[in-house]
C-alpha cells in the first residue's frame, strides 16, 4: 500500500494511510488473525455476520418503503465519535448494550 507525502506533511500521509487500510479491511483482518480461530468458530462467526447483514438489509428496505420509521439523526455534534456515550450507565464500564 502506498501513500504520497506532500510538503513533508507526515501526519496527513499517516491519516490517509490509516483510511486506506480501514477501507481495505486490514485492521479487521489483523484482529481476526491475532489468534487461532477454530474452523467451527469461524463458520459460526461468518454465519452470524451473514444473518446480521440480511437483517440490516431487510430493515433498510422496510424503511425505504415507509413501513418502518426512519431512525432519527442526532443533532450535529451530539455524541459524535463516542459509541455508547448516550444512555444510562455508559460511564461505569458498561458497553453499548449495558452491563452484562
Swiss-Prot record:
Keyword Ribonucleoprotein: yes
Record's compositionally biased regions (Gly residues): 84-100
One of the record's GO molecular function terms: structural constituent of ribosome
Assigned keywords, A-Z: Ribonucleoprotein, Ribosomal protein
Pfam families per the UniProt record, alphabetical: Ribosomal_S21
Family: Belongs to the bacterial ribosomal protein bS21 family.
Alphabetized NCBIfam families for the sequence: S21p (TIGR00030)
Protein name: Small ribosomal subunit protein bS21
Gene behind this protein: rpsU
